[in-house]
């Protein structure tokens, strides 16, 4: 029995390895499950830097009802570190998170746009979708001037306190994306050939292409991501605005995403597509001269390459079959020798 046990053991171990690699998908699906089950009433998370008076201001801005709603939370400073944010920094961004009445892309409303200086609502929507949210209503407020970059950590804190499991990889990629979007917007906002809606949709296309293109038996190289970013920027008429440095940053981010475990989350691409369509529909005539329905998913794919996981599974089945055949041949020969 030793040969067959050996091959069965290899097969089972490899199967569990594949399951482990898709743990991100299960973790992210639990995020939406928690939102649907536990956020019929909104949850409030207050920035860690606010004093008592500012807390009262913020709760009022977020329309908190003490008599009808559950107790609000203060952000734990140490929770910022998983997003690579300095826990000792000045964090005044606060959030309200609630289940949506209807299933639509993540909604973000900034009630103090004069104080949130670096991050727009759609930038937050983009990064929060990368974090793993599918459908939720989020309100952001700050009583003092703030970048807004720490709001995503407050959303994550609320979800984890309610039982969600969010991987560090999701957190880091979402925060890096938010910071990159904010930096590109800040440097290019006054250029005539720059448009924030186009930037957000371009980044969504980069994410879709990276996640779908990475799920194949082909090691993607830096030049593949460089070609992808160049093509997407040209498609959305941003190549004249985005600098070489920013292009390189987009290439690096896309490469990290493609090499992450996020490609095992089947709902993520679906969420990105829904968000893309929503932004385009609300952007007026900004996309009239752009082909927004191009085949984003295949930009990093090669048609003659089979997906990696099915190939691994097929290989394991072949090995198992060879093992069983070897065992039966060995057993038959042993019986003949005894005779």
List each model region and its residues.
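Juxtamembrane/start-of-transmembrane alpha-helix segments at the extracytoplasmic/lumenal side
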Residues: 300-317
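C-terminal membrane-anchoring or membrane-association module
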Residues: 316-339
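Bacterial N-terminal signal peptides that target proteins for export
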Residues: 1-11
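Membrane-proximal extracellular "stem/stalk" segments
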Residues: 218, 227-305
């Amino acid at each position: 029995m030793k040969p067959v046990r050996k091959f069965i053991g290899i097969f089972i171990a490899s199967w569990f390895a594949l399951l482990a690699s898709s743990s991100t998908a299960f973790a992210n699906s639990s995020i939406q499950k928690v939102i649907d089950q536990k956020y019929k009433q909104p949850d409030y998370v207050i920035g860690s830097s606010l004093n008592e008076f500012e807390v009262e201001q913020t709760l009022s801005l977020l329309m908190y009802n003490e008599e009808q709603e559950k107790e609000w939370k203060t952000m734990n400073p140490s929770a910022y570190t998983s997003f690579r944010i300095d826990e000792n920094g000045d964090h005044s961004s606060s959030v309200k998170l609630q289940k949506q009445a209807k299933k639509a892309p993540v909604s973000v409303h900034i009630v103090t746009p004069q104080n949130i200086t670096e991050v727009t609502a759609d930038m937050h929507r983009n990064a929060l979708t990368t974090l793993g949210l599918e459908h939720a209503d989020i309100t952001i407020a700050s009583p003092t001037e703030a970048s807004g970059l720490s709001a995503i950590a407050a959303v994550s804190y609320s979800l984890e306190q309610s039982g969600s499991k969010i991987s560090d990889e999701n957190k880091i990629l979402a925060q890096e994306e938010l910071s990159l979007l904010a930096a590109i917007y800040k440097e290019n906002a006054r250029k005539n050939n720059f448009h924030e809606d186009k930037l957000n949709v371009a980044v969504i296309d980069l994410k879709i292409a990276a996640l779908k293109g990475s799920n194949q038996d082909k090691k993607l190289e830096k030049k593949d991501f460089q070609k992808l970013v160049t093509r997407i920027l040209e498609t959305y008429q941003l190549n004249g605005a985005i600098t070489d440095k920013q292009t390189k940053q987009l290439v690096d981010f896309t490469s990290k995403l493609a090499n992450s475990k996020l490609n095992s989350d089947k709902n993520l691409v679906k969420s990105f597509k829904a968000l893309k369509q929503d932004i385009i529909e609300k952007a007026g005539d900004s996309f009239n001269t752009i082909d927004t329905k191009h085949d984003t998913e295949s930009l990093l794919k090669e048609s003659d390459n089979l997906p990696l996981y099915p190939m691994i599974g097929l290989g394991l089945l072949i090995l198992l079959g060879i093992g069983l055949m070897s065992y039966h041949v060995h057993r038959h020969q042993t019986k003949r020798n005894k005779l």
